[in-house]
């Protein structure tokens, strides 16, 4: 196995703890906490409250999502509807396990007030941490892609979905995603790529540089291959998710227009389409904000043949190094936001938001109809009262019989 420490037992990049906690992505701890920081060493205030808060927040959200999915899964009679629940449950489990494997290490390093090299002289902890970040980071992205594909098939090809998309197939796909990502993350253990200590010397991740002068050419190209493959795989997962979600939204809008033309519960379908589109767009926004900065900056550093390891000696790169650290922290937020975006906020926030939108739209439409045809104002009033008396359905509640989320989750 290749050496996993960034620079052996040399001095840390930053001798003070950084004040921010990037979730599962950074065991931020450094000692000497007592001496004043030197030039370029001021990394912020020290507080163990950040990793503890992130751990509690992520644990509560993902555990609650798993509980709701478990209860809903047992109630489902249709096997086709269980596929969507399996995807959400697997995503919550992935995020939760990722936090439980890394956050305790973060807190331990915080409390120990020691350098990374002192806690991990062999480099094995660095390898474990980098491998864990890679596995659970890519797994979350590709599980989100699998969910997007599943939704698109349920909406655009309901008959094929009903006959081919079984619960067993869903389990096989999810397990295959996890095993494939694990095999990829093990490449540095086999000598292809490297997990190294990153700026400010408080976390381990994939090396994007060519290594030291003494490293071999094959080793350098192995680092570049592994890092670039990780970035391209992440961008591929985002592209799949975006494409499938946009296709789903387009299909829903087309179906809503068809229902409106046929006068088949057009108001109800309009609410469902709006609610669904808001959630899918929210998913895309969260994934973009959380992952795009990290993946794009990794590719930029690979093409420029640089890495955050140069921050130790080049103080002129502090802005770039700090931006990379922010990008890592944004990526770590994804595992905390996932259960809320996919499940929990669906009933808490989306329905109220859609109610406000449709009430405003109905008022505008009513005014326009009354201006066009005053003689039928009485009929318009009855139609408006009838629409208000209806209960707004949950997300994916009457989209298709093959839709896996056909009714809102009940608590």
Curated annotation (Swiss-Prot):
It comes from the Eukaryota. Disulfide bonds join 126-204. Pfam families: 7tm_1. The chain crosses the membrane at residues 50-74, 88-108, 128-149, 172-193, 224-249, 280-303, 324-345. Residues 75-87, 150-171, 250-279, 346-411 are cytoplasmic. Residues 367-390 have a biased composition (Basic and acidic residues). Its main location: membrane. GO terms for cellular component: plasma membrane. Residues 367-392 are annotated as: Disordered. Keywords: Cell membrane, Disulfide bond, G-protein coupled receptor, Glycoprotein, Membrane, Receptor, Transducer, Transmembrane, Transmembrane helix. Glycans are attached at residues 18, 32, 213. Residues 1-49, 109-127, 194-223, 304-323 are extracellular. In the kidney cortex and medulla, adrenal gland and stomach. In kidney, expression is higher in tubules in the outer medulla, with lower levels in cortex. In kidney cortex, expression is restricted to distal tubules. It is found in: Cell membrane. SUPFAM superfamilies: Family A G protein-coupled receptor-like. It is a multi-pass membrane protein. Receptor for prostaglandin E2 (PGE2). Required for normal development of fever in response to pyrinogens, including IL1B, prostaglandin E2 and bacterial lipopolysaccharide (LPS). Required for normal potentiation of platelet aggregation by prostaglandin E2, and thus plays a role in the regulation of blood coagulation. Required for increased HCO3(-) secretion in the duodenum in response to mucosal acidification, and thereby contributes to the protection of the mucosa against acid-induced ulceration. Not required for normal kidney function, normal urine volume and osmolality. PANTHER family: G-PROTEIN COUPLED RECEPTOR FAMILY 1 MEMBER (PTHR11866), PROSTAGLANDIN E2 RECEPTOR EP3 SUBTYPE (PTHR11866:SF10). Interacts (via C-terminus) with MKLN1. This is Prostaglandin E2 receptor EP3 subtype. It comes from Oryctolagus cuniculus. The lineage of its organism: Eukaryota, Metazoa, Chordata, Craniata, Vertebrata. The gene is PTGER3.
């Amino acid at each position: 196995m290749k050496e996993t420490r960034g620079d052996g037992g040399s001095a840390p990049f930053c001798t003070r703890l950084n004040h921010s906690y990037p979730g599962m992505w950074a065991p931020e701890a450094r000692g000497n906490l007592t001496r004043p920081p030197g030039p370029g060493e001021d990394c912020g205030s020290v507080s163990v409250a950040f990793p503890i808060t992130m751990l509690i927040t992520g644990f509560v959200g993902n555990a609650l999502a798993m509980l709701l999915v478990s209860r809903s899964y047992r109630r489902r009679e249709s096997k086709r509807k269980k596929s969507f629940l399996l995807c959400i449950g697997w995503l919550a489990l992935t995020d939760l396990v990722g936090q439980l494997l890394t956050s305790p290490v973060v807190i331990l390093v915080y409390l120990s007030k020691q350098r990374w090299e002192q806690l991990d002289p062999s480099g094995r902890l660095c390898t474990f941490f980098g491998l864990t970040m890679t596995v659970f980071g890519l797994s979350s992205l590709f599980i989100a892609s699998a969910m997007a594909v599943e939704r698109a098939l349920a909406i655009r090809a309901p008959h094929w979905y009903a006959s081919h998309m079984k619960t067993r197939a869903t389990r096989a796909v999810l397990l295959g995603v996890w095993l494939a990502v694990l095999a990829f993350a093990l490449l540095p253990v086999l000598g292809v790529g490297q997990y190294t200590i990153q700026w400010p010397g408080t976390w381990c991740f994939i090396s994007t540089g060519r290594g030291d002068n003494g490293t071999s050419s094959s080793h350098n190209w192995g680092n570049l291959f592994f890092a670039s493959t990780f970035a391209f795989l992440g961008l591929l997962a985002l592209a799949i998710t975006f494409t499938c979600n946009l296709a789903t939204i387009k299909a829903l809008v087309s179906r809503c227009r068809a229902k409106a033309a046929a006068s088949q519960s057009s108001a109800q379908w309009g609410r469902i389409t709006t609610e669904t589109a808001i959630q899918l767009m929210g998913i895309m926004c969260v994934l973009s904000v959380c992952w795009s900065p990290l993946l794009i900056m990794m590719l930029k550093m690979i093409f420029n043949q640089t890495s955050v390891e140069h921050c130790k000696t080049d103080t002129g790169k502090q802005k770039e190094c700090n931006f990379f650290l922010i990008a890592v922290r944004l990526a770590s937020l994804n595992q905390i936001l996932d259960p809320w975006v996919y499940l929990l906020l669906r009933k808490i926030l989306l329905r109220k938001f859609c109610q406000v939108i449709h009430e405003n739209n109905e008022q505008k439409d009513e005014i326009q109809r009354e201006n066009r045809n005053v003689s039928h104002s009485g009929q318009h009033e009855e139609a408006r009262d009838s629409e208000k008396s209806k209960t707004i359905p949950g997300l994916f509640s009457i989209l298709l019989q093959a839709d896996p989320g056909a009714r809102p989750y009940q608590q």
